[in-house]
Amino acid sequence: MGFYQDRIVPHLVNLSMRNSRLAPYRERIASQGEGRVLEIGVGAGANLPLYTDRATEVLGVEPHPRLLNMAASKIGHVPTKLIEGSAESIPLDESSVDTVVTTWTLCTIPDIAKALTEMRRVLKPGGQLLFVEHGLSPDQGVRKWQDRLNPVWKKIAGGCNLNRPITDLIEAAGFRVSRLEKGYMQGPKPLTFMYEGTARRM
């Protein structure tokens, strides 16, 4: 990784993920984590203190070692293991977790289809994928701006994409979306169309 990706992006990620407007989304998602929980893209660990006693163990996978170092100080009361690795090749056995959590992660993973296939592989039958992500807006005017801005945004924001159709991608990987809430969060519309929901392994 270059200097910008290696040194600057981790701090930008940490700062952006501490936005107070994201906190209610995080709390809703983390509080639903049950059993053995796998968090994809644990980042600097913002979700770690939010898991409840419904979770018996949290496994946090993150490709960036600097972010993992930041996450270590955020571990809450639930037993937690931090793992350096990628979502496209999750270092866990098949059908080994009860819950997968992603919060503002699917926008950035390079091979999103492969990553979602991996998430499905490690989930137990009937296991749940809990997600909150920003992505493609249903409004044509906003979509045009997302498409225009995406090439530049992706470069400055560590690979983040503004225009991924989140639920379509999840369902294409073999999940059934059982709960979904969509809408704009406060802020520039190309950046703030949110998808929050639950999907089950089919």
Question: Predicted segments — roles?
Answer:
Residues 126-134:
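Conserved beta-strand signature within the Rossmann-like core of class I S-adenosyl-L-methionine
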Residues 175, 182-202:
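Core SAM-dependent methyltransferase catalytic element
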Residues 38, 44-89:
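Class I SAM-dependent methyltransferase SAM/SAH-binding core
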Residues 113-125:
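A short glycine-rich, Lys/Arg-flanked "PGG" loop and its adjoining helix->strand segment in the class I
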Residues 88-100:
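A short acidic, Gly/Pro-enriched loop at the edge of an enzyme's catalytic core
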Residues 16-36, 46-47:
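Conserved alpha-helix/loop element of class I SAM-dependent methyltransferases that forms part
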Residues 158-174:
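Short alpha-helix
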Residues 99-111:
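A short SAM/SAH-binding and catalytic strip from SAM-dependent methyltransferases
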